[in-house]
Structures are given as C-alpha cells and as structure tokens.
Amino acid sequence: MSELTHVRADGSAHMVDVTAKAETSRTAVAEGFVRTRADVVDKLFTADLPKGDALPVARVAGIMGAKKTPEIIPLCHPLPLGKITVDFERLPDGVRIEASVKTRGVTGVEMEALTAVTTAALTVYDMIKAVDKMAVIDGVRVLAKTGGKSGDWSV
C-alpha cells in the first residue's frame, strides 16, 4: 500500500505532508445537476416554491460548503480560498450547477469545487422536495483544474 499517498504501510489513513510543496495559483471547476419536472423548474426559476427563493439560498450554501470542505472531508487540507462562485443554468428537466474555486496554496481545490456543487444541489433538493419528492441529483464531476504538479486539464 505504500504507493497510496493517504495510507500508511499498516493500512491506516493519514493526512499527507504538504509542507515542502510550493504555493501556486490553483483553480477547479465542477458541475452537477438537479433533475426535476418542468413545472418545478418554472417554480425554481420564478422563486415560487413553498420554502422560498431557492437559488440565492443554494448559492450561499454552496459557497459555505466549499469553505467547510476540510471539516467534512477528513483528509482535505484547509486552504485559504480566494474566490468561490456558484452559478445556475436553467434546463428543461432541471438545473445545472457550476462552481469555481480559486486559491493560492500547496494543494488543489477540486474537493472544494465538488463540495460547493453538491451542497448547492442538496439545498435545491431540500427546497423543491415539497413539490417533487422524486427529484434526482446527478452528474457531479470536476470539469477542469489548473495549477500544481499534475498541471492543467479539462474535460
């Protein structure tokens, strides 16, 4: 198991030592979807849900989620996040959520971008479940990252 960075020889997990790594500018972009009925999409984008205007609440929840990532994902390093955006795109069958996170640090922000998307998606689900208990969260993935030893990439 020695080739696994977060696992010691005895199989126990540990947080990787990043103290010798150089700080670089890093970004990550992630997306996810909440699938629901067309009438619920209308309610979502016109702020006509029983719980209120879901998208501003989900945006703030996503930003908060990114900031809390090292508190809920055990082996993530705390990072000084310089910018977090959470945006929504209306689709015929739901909403596409995209989060972008930037930092200057020693490790990437992919987990923060994923946490922003999933937290925003969970918030949308929470706020639409009164009108659609069958809504689905899916397609959560990293779209792009920049910086660090592994370089830049995108799907």
Swiss-Prot record:
Keywords: Lyase, Molybdenum cofactor biosynthesis
Domain of life: Bacteria
Protein name: Cyclic pyranopterin monophosphate synthase
Matching HAMAP family: MoaC_B
Subunit text: Homohexamer; trimer of dimers.
E.C. number: 4.6.1.17
GO molecular function: cyclic pyranopterin monophosphate synthase activity
